[in-house]
Amino acid sequence: MDQQRLTHLRQLEAESIHIIREVAAEFANPVMMYSIGKDSSVMLHLARKAFYPGTLPFPLLHVDTGWKFREMYEFRDRMVKNIGAELLVHRNPEGLAMGINPFVHGSAKHTDIMKTEGLKQALDKYGFDAAFGGARRDEEKSRAKERIYSFRDRFHRWDPKNQRPELWHNYNGQVNKGESIRVFPLSNWTELDIWQYIFLENIEIVPLYLAAPRPVLERDGMLMMIDDDRINLQPGEVIEQRMVRFRTLGCWPLTGAVESEAQTLPGIIEEMLVSTTSERQGRMIDRDQAGSMELKKRQGYF
């Protein structure tokens, strides 16, 4: 394929499809992480393109904390049913037994037990040797230096000083027993690329990405949308309706909304063209401490 004859988005698409096919051919038991967000939706769309008209040759995996937005769960179940994919859902049973939640135990412990440990449990349980993720290099500085094939040891830990070179489009997938890789087909995409591709391909997304009047309160410097009754209001807090949307999605107590009037995909793209802040500014887990994302990845986080 002559890359010079392709548009920017089609070049990114071709690269991602090549990576997905390469992993499917090279590894014995791959899986695709499905977190229900915009990047996961694009990655799933690319995977379906990669193997069309056949079905996906690997299952989807959702590591569920029990604290996602209700609209995310509804979207997940509908999407999986519509495309006929196999979905595996894993919740950390020890975390559930301990009643771990972001309000009582804080974002760091909640993320470590319900997401990081939950992910490692699921990968071990099913014996996956490769796991696709939707992370992009423009999101955060630790992800900017991570390879497309991110190697993990038998404890799922990432060592940024022990990464293999990736020359041109050649990827080294050799792993020893117990080791695995995390694969990031969207590494070279930007947030703007993602939205332009969603618009171009008419990819369905969770409605929370579009601006609408929603019940929110201000806490810890972010706008928290109240999604159910598991919250206790602090003195002086008031729930009010505001026109907001989300640039990134996660557990609802840990994900901040942004005030916006963008009710359509062109409106979101217009916002992205003038935005000077990271989409992860609304993720409470990234504020735990300096370099917290890299520390999480060293411990096994995606």
Curated annotation (Swiss-Prot):
GO molecular function, one term: sulfate adenylyltransferase (ATP) activity
Keyword field: ATP-binding, Nucleotide-binding, Nucleotidyltransferase, Transferase
Pathways per UniProt: Sulfur metabolism; hydrogen sulfide biosynthesis; sulfite from sulfate: step 1/3
Enzyme class label: transferase
NCBIfam families: CysD, PRK05253.1, PRK12563.1
Family to which the UniProt record says this protein belongs: Belongs to the PAPS reductase family. CysD subfamily.
Subunit structure: Heterodimer composed of CysD, the smaller subunit, and CysN.
Protein name as it appears in the record: Sulfate adenylyltransferase subunit 2
Gene name for this UniProt entry: cysD
